[in-house]
């Protein structure tokens, strides 16, 4: 039954979330290690030094969890988009043209628009505004999955069904670009400018973990609940990240302050 499938999905999701939280909390404990033990961080390689410096920041655990789950809703749906197109009877040509080629162009356009909005309104506001738009786009696919019948021999897709899925794909691609622009701006803003490349790689690795989980869980969720129910559920996966925004705001302020203090003073 659908309700049992939902319960199982959330049990697995919470189990993974708790495990990740426990691991991050354990890593964050290194912040309280004796100062003498931190003197050799730099001698253990740039990656290790960057990791230790990152984990000693105040409030880093909630921020790492935010990075982990901010695009979880988008990733969870993304893995099942192509199977949904196929099961709905769309041709490989349509999938390649609309979902891939046009979708890529709209994602780039969304990235440009998201970058403009982030620059005008600031990273913090862009994260929750553009992140919300990114989540709402999942409902378009949920609607399409509820309306479009499964493919069957002899059936021809109606024009309105094609138009509905084309529209859902366009909105999802564009808003995905919006959210990505704000998210990448956030990652670049909080890295230490002295080791930006290394810290950015570490933070990107944390983000990649959510895609790994989403790839595994998406097939189970879609099979258990159907495409429409699963796409609708992914909409709600976006909101846990919003509870962590206070820590995100504090981290942005801390990074901005640290960057300002590092700038050389202007001398007359």
Q: Residue ranges of each PLM-predicted region?
A:
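Cytoplasmic membrane-interface "Motif A"-like loop-to-helix N-cap segments
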Residues: 119-133
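Short amphipathic helix-loop junctions that connect adjacent transmembrane helices
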Residues: 79-96
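Multi-pass alpha-helical transporter architecture, strongest
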Residues: 26-30, 230-264
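Intracellular juxtamembrane helix-capping segments at the cytosolic ends
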Residues: 178-192
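C-terminal ends and interior cores of transmembrane alpha-helices
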Residues: 132-158, 246
């Amino acid at each position: 039954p659908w309700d049992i499938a939902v319960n199982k999905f959330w049990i697995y999701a919470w189990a993974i979330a708790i495990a990740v939280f426990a691991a991050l909390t354990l890593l964050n404990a290194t912040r309280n290690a004796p100062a003498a033990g931190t003197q050799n961080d730099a001698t253990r390689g740039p990656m290790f030094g960057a990791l230790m410096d990152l984990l000693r920041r105040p409030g880093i655990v909630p921020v790492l969890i935010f990075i982990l789950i901010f695009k979880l809703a988008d990733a969870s749906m993304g893995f099942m988009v192509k199977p949904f197109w196929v099961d709905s009877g769309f041709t490989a040509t349509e999938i390649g043209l609309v979902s891939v080629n046009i979708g890529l162009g709209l994602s780039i356009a969304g990235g440009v628009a998201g970058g403009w909005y982030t620059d005008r309104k600031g990273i913090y506001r862009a994260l929750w505004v553009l992140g919300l738009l990114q989540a709402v786009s999942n409902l378009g696919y949920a609607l399409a999955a509820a309306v479009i019948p499964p493919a069957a021999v002899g059936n021809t897709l109606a024009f309105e069904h094609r138009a509905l899925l084309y529209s859902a794909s366009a909105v999802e691609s564009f808003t995905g670009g919006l959210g990505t622009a704000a998210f990448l701006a956030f990652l670049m803003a909080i890295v230490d400018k002295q080791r930006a490349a290394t810290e950015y790689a570490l933070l990107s690795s944390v983000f990649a973990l959510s895609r790994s989980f989403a790839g595994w869980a998406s097939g189970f969720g879609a099979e258990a609940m159907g495409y429409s129910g699963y796409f609708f559920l992914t909409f709600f996966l976006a909101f846990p990240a919003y509870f962590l925004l206070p820590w995100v705001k504090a981290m942005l302020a801390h990074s901005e302050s640290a960057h300002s203090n590092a700038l050389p003073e202007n001398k007359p």
